[in-house]
Amino acid sequence: MRQRDLKFTFVVGEGKLAFDVVEFELEEALCEPFRLNLKLASDKNAIDFRQVLDQPGTFTLWQDGRPARYVHGIVSHFTQGSSGFRRTRYELLLEPQLARLELCCNWRIFQEKSVPEILQALLKEHRVLDYEQRIYHEHLPREYCVQAGDSDHYLHDRLAFEEGLVYYFRFDEHRHTLVCSDRLYVQERIAGGPVLFSAQPEGDNPQPVLHSFRYSENVRTARQTQRDYSFKRPTYDQEHHLAGEALEHQGSSYERYDYPGRYKRSGAGRPFSESRLRGHRRDARVASVSGDDPRLIPGHAFALEGHPRADFNAWWRPVRVVHRGTQYAGQEEESADAPLGVSYDLRAELVPEDVEWRPAPLPRPRIDGPQIATVVGPAGEEIHCDEWGRVKVQFPWDREGRHDEFSTCWIRVAQNWAGADWGHMAIPRIGQEVIVDYLDGDCDQPIVTGRTYRATNRPPYALPDHKILSTIKSKEYKGSRANELRIDDTTAQISAALMSDHGASALHLGYLTHPRPEGGKPRGEGFELRTDEHGAVRAAKGLLLSTEEQLRAGAGHLDRGVVVQVLEAALKLARELGDYAGEHQGVGHDAAPQQTLQEAVRDLGHGANDESGKSNGGKPAIALSGPAGIAAATPASLTLAAGEHVDSVARQNQQVTAGQKVVINAGSDIGLFAQGGELRQITHQGPMLLQAQKNDIRLEAEQSVEVSASQQHVLVTAKEHITLMCGGAYLTLKGGNIELGMPGNFVVKAAKHSHVGPAHASTSFNAWDSTPFDDRYVLRDEATLEPLPNIAVEVIRGDGGVVKLMTDSQGRLPKQQHLAMDPVQIRILGKGSHNSDTESNT
């Protein structure tokens, strides 16, 4: 229609550059940047584009000489068209500052920020200072939110729509304000009273009205169900169900089930589901109108009056409006018949005011494939993880990260196994390159799935030189040593090794070599368990150490047939010889402990999976078996100890050799029994002592007993008496007397016979060169302990012999000698410090 009380104007900057408006079309909607397309005219035919492009501009719709509507924005497009006789045509696009966000895209990470906080930061970055947030509900922080190459505007809208935020614009002459809120119902209402409806033809209404009103209802999703997963609560499905509003005119069974719901906290699940459902039902009840009331603005509610259907006369909220206008005066040249007047109309989409309208959810960005990243952490640290083994990484695309513990959130790491307190664990270390994939392609759900070598992290062995080596090699935390499991697949030389640099400890299996990188010189075949530190082998149910052949593990791992046979034969031999010795006055043999041990070795594997049908064994015994022999050697000492018996059995010879002494001590009996051969005890250099300290010595022989001294003498002594008997004759030495008796003749043959006075054997020993027992006595003052020189004493020997002696200048007496221990009594005769008797037993 034509309305001569309307006028359109447009100025750029602060009113310094004005244009005549020829035509305009303004498209504006909730949650969309507006677009004002202007066709302009100016008497200037050479306008500097710098004065217009990317500059603020204000469009004003005047009604009755007063501004009825402002549209303020930034010039995004400017075109100079044809020039007429007096005027030049121009075209221009005016958009909000928010539209500039579409010009920028980025890769970056937001951590521990709520969506309102992210939007504020994003707009502040683009200097969108006229921004107002109206937040009525709690919005939980997002642990990790990524802008994955999409535009800043797409990020803004995606996050806002997910979180249930709507935005619209509020205008004045000098600015446009972006208003963002999580509740639509409480927002603005237009000024100036109700909007009128009139069904009269266009142009017949004296005031702005809506002359067309079409109301529709559409069958839409009735229920929204969403689920998501959190590894911290794996058994909780985080499922949320919501039913739509105003379902009276449609079925309620139309459910939309989405997974994942893109929320990790249950508290965010309901609002997320609610926003999505509202987006799906955004046009369930909608009205399409047309008219010429310029007050209709998206987001601003109005009351409708004058509609013939009473229930349509209610509060409505525009969600989309398209304004069009033509100002013929702005396009006039010099033609006298140019049309005059102004034309303006609008088309709009409305929803009831009480509807919490939300836009359709935007598709979430998807990462096309895995990405490379570097593990990071605090300075000076090598391993940085949390209780779940998660790590932090620095992506190559992240310009804001500082390669530290704040570069990302904690990111989960895929392991080969992950069980309940069991599985594989190898935490990626700081500086390692990792492969990061994304669950469901979601940029906000990274997961480390692998690791790769690179120039700064070389493989453990030079390649391809050592391509036959497979290894798991770790590095000492904050050190330079390593632990390693290495497999060598060299042809005909395969081996495996489990190694630790601590103590050079290792288990080598197979074809043993020195390290391949150092030449790989052979060093044996089989296995080697070695360390520079301590070692221990423990088996609680028994241990078999054997060199018995068992090719390719063809029998049970405790196959011990040979050692059991040898032990049984040894037990049999010990019993036979022991019993025979006992029957012939030898010391009795106790074979029970030996039999117990033999049975323990026999039953060593009973109860194991290959001997499960037999009685339980598993006694903690050790069996050593060497078909070719067992050698135990040490340059130091060898100790063999037993709490019960030590049974040593040899089917042939048992030989004991010592370079110096052989000492055998027994707490009870010692039995030596030679069943069929000799028993020899020989000292080659030193003396031989055969002594019974508390009892008797008996020498018995079925044949003869011979006693000889090839170089010196044979001495027989006794305290009580000595008796020699043979054939009824006897000789007895007793009490200093000699008695001879015989049933036959007494023959004495000698070259000379001498008869002298009495003598004692004890005193005669002092004249011997040496005897086994000798003593030197020193006489001392009892008080001062000083030696007493020149004191006469009387020494009384055990057999009654008496010797008078004198101490020398140092108080010493002459040496007293005997073949055995002998009691001695010393009596002081001369004057000295003490006259008391002193006795000494030796």
Swiss-Prot record:
Gene3D superfamilies: 2.30.110.50, 4.10.220.110, Baseplate protein-like domains, Gp5 N-terminal domain. InterPro entries: Gp5/Vgr_OB, T6SS_Rhs_Vgr_dom, T6SS_RhsGE_Vgr_subset, T6SS_Vgr_RhsGE, T6SS_VgrG/RHS, Vgr_OB-fold_dom_sf, VgrG2_DUF2345. GO terms for biological process: protein secretion by the type VI secretion system. Residues 265-291 are annotated as: Disordered. Disruption phenotype: Deletion leads to a 75% loss of internalization of P.aeruginosa into host cell. Transmembrane segments: none annotated. GO terms for cellular component: type VI protein secretion system complex. Belongs to the VgrG protein family. Part of the H2 type VI secretion system (H2-T6SS) specialized secretion system, which delivers several virulence factors in both prokaryotic and eukaryotic cells during infection. May form the spike at the tip of the elongating tube formed by haemolysin co-regulated protein 2a/Hcp2a. In turn, may allow the delivery of the Tle4 antibacterial toxin to target cells where it exerts its toxicity. Also promotes the release of VgrG2b toxin to the host cell. NCBIfam families: vgr_GE, VI_Rhs_Vgr. PANTHER family: PTHR32305, TYPE VI SECRETION SYSTEM SPIKE PROTEIN VGRG3. This is Type VI secretion system spike protein VgrG2a. It comes from Pseudomonas aeruginosa (strain ATCC 15692 / DSM 22644 / CIP 104116 / JCM 14847 / LMG 12228 / 1C / PRS 101 / PAO1).
